[in-house]
């Protein structure tokens, strides 16, 4: 069930009897968070509201979408009962009936104005903002006496019955049983990773940090309708950082998800920014807002390294995966005019077949393109999305010393991993031919001190990978590949120490 349970306990902490009429109130928005900004009124007209013995059920007629409206298949319910299962005596199913004339949600007349009786079960209304206003029977609490109420906030499919939901959750004893089950579930989730640093508050905070990636998978990121940032989906960093947590907590699912994530990498070293719900579901950005972050190429290796360290699965580097392809090329600085949406979002070779490369090849694409993509100080450049606050505009001349250091460390890691592949009997690796010129130590070493030489080499690579690649593969010996990566890492380390430290 998609249900949130809430228990409210009223206690008389005074010295005299207290008489009151308890009222619970939960607004029912009942549609996409987008409608908080666009078409709020017209979508409220779609609401079909029913009063139920235990509360309010809203079933909109349509799911509003200007690209094509769809019949709605879910209902939104706010139901409640006293601790012993007794139903409310009346409900206020709309914002208008709950707030009253001249009232507000801070001072609703249904609560403060005598004589507003609410509606009984079995009433139907249409076209209003919905409200889960539940009035319970008038009670008198003696000093020290307590009274509990249980609320069930649910999203129901067509075949789900509100009565069944209340039978399952709707009294104090059932609430307590489900609360115990819920605590046990999350305690077991968190038990796989425990941190004790001798300070109780910090240990508790670490439990919350451990829990966050799981909640993010369930809820998305900034999913609140009035939040400043985000629409509930996950970004590129989230994919890899969430995998880090899952490696420690739920490692069984990680390998397939990790492999799927690599399908989002473009051949220019950037990556898809619109991420679907299913693993490996990456979509073309058609809103004409190219977004590239310079650090995005660094994170996949860190997650992959932890996976291999924990599993010993070095052969993962040899698994093959597709590349992402859309209209953006040259790290979103240009558009591939030959690409159309009908071409799909998978890189193809000149014969029209989908190209698949090893995971190691994907990692090389990310790191080699970053190595040559330098600014005037020979430090890896910032990209347009790194400074998008409308003021700094560091994309034009900005460089990042911190992430250059991370890429340097990663190149050293890659060099060591290449050597380690010999343990599997591997002697050479094969990569698409257009990538090999970026391994310049194999044929014609570049002067790494020359910014112009690096930029020219990267431009040559971009030019031959704009739309498709030939599909030819070139063999590279492990030792030669490792030496090239080590040379790049060594140069970056020395350059940073000499110029930036």
Residue ranges, per PLM feature:
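Polysaccharide-binding surfaces and accessory modules of carbohydrate-active proteins
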Residues: 1-114, 165-192, 327-330, 334-341
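Beta-strand-rich recognition/accessory modules
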Residues: 5-7, 33, 79-177, 388-406, ...
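Inter-helical turn/loop segments and adjacent helix faces that build the functional surface
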Residues: 13-17, 159-160, 310-319, 414-430, ...
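Short, glycine/acidic-rich hinge or "gate" loops at secondary-structure transitions
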Residues: 39, 162-164, 274-275, 314-324, ...
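Acidic/polar, glycine-enriched structural segments that form the non-catalytic walls/loops
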Residues: 117, 134, 139-140, 145-231, ...
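Aromatic-rich carbohydrate-recognition surfaces in CAZymes
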Residues: 144, 239, 246-254, 258-376, ...
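Acidic/His metal-coordination segments adjacent to aromatic residues that form catalytic metal sites
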Residues: 216-224, 273-291, 382-398
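Extended ligand-binding clefts on enzyme/binding-domain cores
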Residues: 316-382, 386, 401-402, 437-501
